[in-house]
């Protein structure tokens, strides 16, 4: 997807690990096969919400997974094969840095979005982007306040600090915390409780179908 509108100035990056290794904490409620289906569906709904935001110029998915790559391409996203070598001490942030380099060819303003935001509404992301423009770097925490749902960098280096306790690490790196009321944007999925909370908000069609089929 490439939005050529004059005001479309955001390059959006989503990192996705191998589906077979994703969301193992959902094992109490979903089989391995169903977890893969739900994770892929959440990615589809996340991209689907993001690509309709007028400010988003391009979506780049960085992943080592063929299934995730195919799904992203069908939605019009670009795909970067994750170059992170096996055994890397910080694979997620390495993948994001590689994606940052790739997407800067067309956008100087970059947003990292979690790929498991099935309740994300386009208006929430649009509002968060508007708020983020007031700062060189900013972020939105997850609903627990400890993780990072989105990281924004306008004309400056991304400096991703994702992982456990990432909200505090992004705060310490100088990024400004955005405090808007964006429940869908904050509802990334790690646990069965997170999935229930997202369903209460209302998940996208792909996730709804995958959960119903599980």
Curated annotation (Swiss-Prot):
Catalysed reaction equations from the record: phosphoenolpyruvate + GTP + H(+) = enolpyruvoyl-2-diphospho-5'-guanosine + diphosphate
Pathway(s) it belongs to: Cofactor biosynthesis; coenzyme F420 biosynthesis
Keyword entries, A-Z: GTP-binding, Nucleotide-binding, Nucleotidyltransferase, Transferase
GO molecular-function term, one example from the UniProt record: GTP binding
Short name of one Pfam family: CofC
Keyword Membrane listed: no
InterPro entries: CofC, Nucleotide-diphossugar_trans
Superkingdom to which the source organism belongs: Bacteria
Gene Ontology biological process terms, A to Z: F420-0 metabolic process
Family matches, as Gene3D superfamilies: Spore Coat Polysaccharide Biosynthesis Protein SpsA, Chain A
Residues reported in the UniProt entry to bind phosphoenolpyruvate: 148, 163, 166
Keyword Nucleotidyltransferase: yes
UniProt-listed Enzyme Commission number(s): 2.7.7.105
Function of the protein: Guanylyltransferase that catalyzes the activation of phosphoenolpyruvate (PEP) as enolpyruvoyl-2-diphospho-5'-guanosine, via the condensation of PEP with GTP. It is involved in the biosynthesis of coenzyme F420, a hydride carrier cofactor.
Family that this chain belongs to: Belongs to the CofC family.
PANTHER family noted in UniProt: 2-PHOSPHO-L-LACTATE GUANYLYLTRANSFERASE
Protein name as it appears in the record: Phosphoenolpyruvate guanylyltransferase
Biological source species: Mycolicibacterium gilvum (strain PYR-GCK)
Gene name, Swiss-Prot/TrEMBL: fbiD
């Amino acid at each position: 997807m490439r939005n050529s509108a004059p005001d479309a100035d955001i390059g959006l990056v989503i990192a996705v690990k191998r589906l077979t290794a994703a969301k193992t904490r959902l094992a109490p409620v979903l089989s391995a096969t169903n977890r893969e289906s739900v994770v892929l569906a959440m990615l589809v709904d996340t991209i689907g919400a993001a690509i309709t935001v007028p400010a988003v110029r391009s979506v780049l998915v960085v992943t080592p997974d063929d299934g995730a790559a195919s799904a992203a391409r069908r939605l019009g996203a670009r795909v970067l094969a994750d170059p992170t070598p096996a055994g890397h001490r910080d694979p997620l942030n390495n993948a994001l840095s590689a994606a940052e380099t790739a997407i800067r060819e067309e956008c100087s303003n970059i947003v990292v979005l979690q790929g498991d935001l099935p309740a994300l509404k386009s208006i929430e992301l649009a509002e968060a982007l508007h708020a983020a423009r007031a700062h060189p770097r900013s972020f939105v925490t997850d609903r627990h306040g400890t993780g990072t749902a989105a990281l924004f960098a306008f004309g400056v280096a991304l400096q991703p600090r994702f992982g456990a306790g990432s909200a505090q690490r992004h705060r310490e790196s100088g990024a400004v915390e955005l405090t808007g009321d964006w429940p869908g944007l904050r509802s990334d999925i790690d646990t069965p409780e997170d999935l229930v909370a997202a369903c209460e908000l209302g998940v996208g069609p792909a996730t709804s179908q995958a959960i119903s089929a599980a």
